[in-house]
Every structure is written in structure tokens, then in C-alpha cells.
Amino acid sequence: MEDSEKKLNQKSDDKPRKVRFKISSSYSGRVLKQVFEDGQELESPKEEYPHSFLQEALEPMDGVYGSGEVPKPQPYSPKLTAQRISVFRDSGAYTLAGSQPLFNDYKANDHKPPPIIDFGKIIIYTNNLKIIRTPMDKRDFMRKILQKEDVAEEASLMITGENDGDREQGCPLPERNGSPLPESERTFLHSQHTQDGLVPEDCLHCQGSGIATCSLCHGSKFSMLANRFKESYRALRCPACNENGLQPCRICSP
């Protein structure tokens, strides 16, 4: 019976098995995992990749021993007998998967079997992660808009109060040789002073506040240069306005 089983095993070994998929390291070329078409897995095959075969025989795992076998005392932590250990580095401290310390819980008489590790997952490690600011919800957006309107209204009220005080004191009309100027010349002077930023209280764009909604982002504060589908992040916030989405008036500001 043993001879027939050996012959069958030799015949099965002679037939090349088709590999379903294989995972290898792009840095060293070492084969990490190999699964054949029949579903069997082969970790670090010795026949094809002898340099990547680390152990000739693995120790009994999960505390399973034969009838006459006795577990041998281990001089080191049983966690190191696992086939695969995920080590994470965080500010100089090395921890295992599950936030367990590596050697802090080591004891000389610790002979517990190693924990069961989940081998049914493929984990991809990358260092090309970027954090993108989450968009505001509707309530936050409306709250910010109301805050902007309150700021603009307060500024306009302050400027209007100052102008009312000046009018109460009596601002003389422009005159020439002791007589008031005609309406056409007064309109021309008004437009000229408006361009120079001397009379912002009569500006139709900002209504005398001196500040207006941003013409680029229209108060949303999102930059048009931030392309979220490519690696071309130049600015996440609009560079033309302040934190409230406002900018100086283009008509009456100097």
C-alpha cells in the first residue's frame, strides 16, 4: 500500500500543475503566496524558489500534537512561531497586529500556542495616501452664508451711520465761482470719485460696505484650481477672498 501511494504521489508530482495566481514581492522578487488551479496553496515553494524557502519543517501549530508527543519548552515568545507576523511602526514603537506589544508581555514560562492568524485576506500597503477635506453639509453651508450676510450688513450699517453723521453736519455741494455746479458735471465728478474710491457709500456693487462677495468662488471659498480627479492640488481654498468668502469691492476700493 505504501509503495502504491508513493508511485501515485510521484506521478502527481511529475504532472505540472497550473498556477491560478501568484503574489510576489516587487522589491526582492520573493514569492509570497501561490495558489494552484485545484485550490491548493503553496507558500514559498522550495522547488522553484529555493532562496525564498525559510523553513524545512514548521512546528505544530495551534496546539495540535500527536498521541505520544509532548510540547517542547520554547525559549522565546510563541508569537514568533506564527507563519506570518504583521509588524506596525508608530513613532519608534513596534507593535503586532491587533495593537499587541511585541516583547513586552514575554515570560519565561509562557508556552501558550500562538494565536490564529487570518490568512484569507490580501492586504495592500501603500504610502501614497492623501487626506482631502470633506465637503460641508447643507446646514454648515447655510450657517456660513448667514454669517457672511451678518458681517456685510454690520459693515454697511457702520458706514451708513458715519455718512449720516457727515450729512447732519452739512456737506456743501460742489460749487464754481460761488454757484452750484450743474447736474451733468456733478454726475461726472461722482463717477470719477467712485473710480478713485472716495465715495464708497454710493457704490451700487457693494452698497457702501467696501466689501463684496468673491467674484471667483461666489462665496463658496472653494478654489477652481483644485482638480480632485488628478494629482494637481494647487490650492484647496480660493486665493482671491478671505475666510468669509469676501473681497474688497472692485469699483470703490482703492
UniProtKB/Swiss-Prot annotation:
Reported phenotype of the disruption mutant: Mice appear normal at postnatal week 2, but develop progressive hearing loss associated with early defects in orientation and organization of cochlear stereocilia bundles. They have normal vestibular function. Reducing Tprn expression corrects stereocilium morphological defects and partially restores hearing in Grxcr2 mutant mice.
Chief location bin: other
SUPFAM superfamilies hit by this protein: DnaJ/Hsp40 cysteine-rich domain
Signal sequence, renumbered to the chain: none
Keywords: Cell projection, Hearing
A Gene Ontology biological process term: inner ear receptor cell stereocilium organization
Tissue: Expressed in sensory hair cells in the cochlea and vestibular organ.
Keyword hit for Cell membrane: no
Comp. bias (Basic and acidic residues): 1-16
Cellular localization per UniProt: Cell projection, Stereocilium
Statement: the UniProt record of this protein carries the keyword Protein biosynthesis: no
Any one Pfam family match given in the protein's UniProt record, by short name: GRXCR1-2_C
GO CC annotations, alphabetized: cytosol; microvillus; stereocilium base; stereocilium shaft
Region Disordered: start-end pairs: 1-20, 161-183
Family per similarity comment: Belongs to the GRXCR2 family.
Function: Required for hearing. Plays a role in maintaining cochlear stereocilia bundles that are involved in sound detection. Ensures the restriction of TPRN to the basal region of stereocilia in hair cells.
Quaternary assembly: Interacts with TPRN; the interaction restricts TPRN to the stereocilum basal region.
Protein name per UniProt: Glutaredoxin domain-containing cysteine-rich protein 2
